[in-house]
Amino acid sequence: MDARDIIKRPVVTEESTSILDDKKYTFEVDTRATKTQVKYAIEEIFDVKVAKVNVMNYKGKLKRMGRYAGYTNKRRKAIVTVTADSKEIQFFEV
């Protein structure tokens, strides 16, 4: 898998912006990606040194449209902690 295929998009929420001070960045990643693949992808794309990766899996929610039921896509979210001597990822700057 290519690094750009592993990292889908940044997750910008109130909680994810509050942990930016601790050099923790939140991304939505491919559901098949491992922690090691996420680490190498972040280091390749943003040119930073990753200290730790935490991942969370989310099941798809049941959604109904009248009598038809289906599920939303399952998701995988990664919180990436970069080292103290790494530069900030400018992707999140406003």
Swiss-Prot record:
Keywords: Ribonucleoprotein, Ribosomal protein, RNA-binding, rRNA-binding
GO CC terms, sorted: ribonucleoprotein complex; ribosome
UniProt GO molecular function: rRNA binding; structural constituent of ribosome
Signal sequence bounds: none
Annotated GO biological process: translation
InterPro entries: Nucleotide-bd_a/b_plait_sf (IPR012677), Ribosomal_uL23-like (IPR013025), Ribosomal_uL23/eL15/eS24_sf (IPR012678)
Keyword RNA-binding: yes
Ribonucleoprotein as UniProt keyword: yes
Known role: One of the early assembly proteins it binds 23S rRNA. One of the proteins that surrounds the polypeptide exit tunnel on the outside of the ribosome. Forms the main docking site for trigger factor binding to the ribosome.
PANTHER family: 60S RIBOSOMAL PROTEIN L23A
Self-association and partners: Part of the 50S ribosomal subunit. Contacts protein L29, and trigger factor when it is bound to the ribosome.
Family under the similarity heading: Belongs to the universal ribosomal protein uL23 family.
Name recorded for this polypeptide: Large ribosomal subunit protein uL23
